[in-house]
Amino acid sequence: MILGIGNDLVDVRRIERTIERFGDRFLDRVFTEAERRRAERRSAAGPHSPRAATYAKRFAAKEACAKALGTGLNKGVYWRDMGVVNLPGGRPTLALTGGALERLRQITPPGMVAEIHLTLTDELPIAQAIVLISAVPAPQP
């Protein structure tokens, strides 16, 4: 059962300019420590740097997730409540905390478990994320 779908496009140049202008103030407000560690391993050299693209994809993922949750970035859902993480095989997903996790619990029907599916891509200067939140029957003991 699909609980929510969200999609977002971000101009990598916009994220690059925002980082140049606000630096750590922006990065600390929007991204989790794990996201920052991953992005900071990427090269910051040149226009449309891999570092900026990494941040842009994660920014788009947060926007898409907030849309899939049906709240946008309000109603107690904040940027750092949603963090892009990678599963052991490398596939990206979102780890939710705080208000985002609470909203996920609210929209998940009893007896079901929510699953978050995330796809990220970029074709410079655009980064895109699509989030699909589904509910599947909870495992039986």
UniProtKB/Swiss-Prot annotation:
Mg(2+) binds at residues 8, 63. InterPro entries: 4-PPantetheinyl_Trfase_dom, 4-PPantetheinyl_Trfase_dom_sf, ACPS, Ppantetheine-prot_Trfase_dom. It is found in: Cytoplasm. It is an enzyme of class 2 (transferase). Keywords: Cytoplasm, Fatty acid biosynthesis, Fatty acid metabolism, Lipid biosynthesis, Lipid metabolism, Magnesium, Metal-binding, Transferase. One of its GO terms (biological process) is fatty acid biosynthetic process. Coiled coil: none annotated. Its cofactor is Mg(2+). Its main location: cytoplasm. One of its GO terms (cellular component) is cytoplasm. Signal peptide: none annotated. SUPFAM superfamilies: 4'-phosphopantetheinyl transferase (SSF56214). It catalyses: apo-[ACP] + CoA = holo-[ACP] + adenosine 3',5'-bisphosphate + H(+). GO terms for molecular function: holo-[acyl-carrier-protein] synthase activity; magnesium ion binding. Its EC number is 2.7.8.7. Transfers the 4'-phosphopantetheine moiety from coenzyme A to a Ser of acyl-carrier-protein. Belongs to the P-Pant transferase superfamily. AcpS family. HAMAP family: AcpS. This is Holo-[acyl-carrier-protein] synthase. The lineage of its organism: Bacteria, Pseudomonadati, Pseudomonadota, Alphaproteobacteria, Rhodospirillales. The gene is acpS.
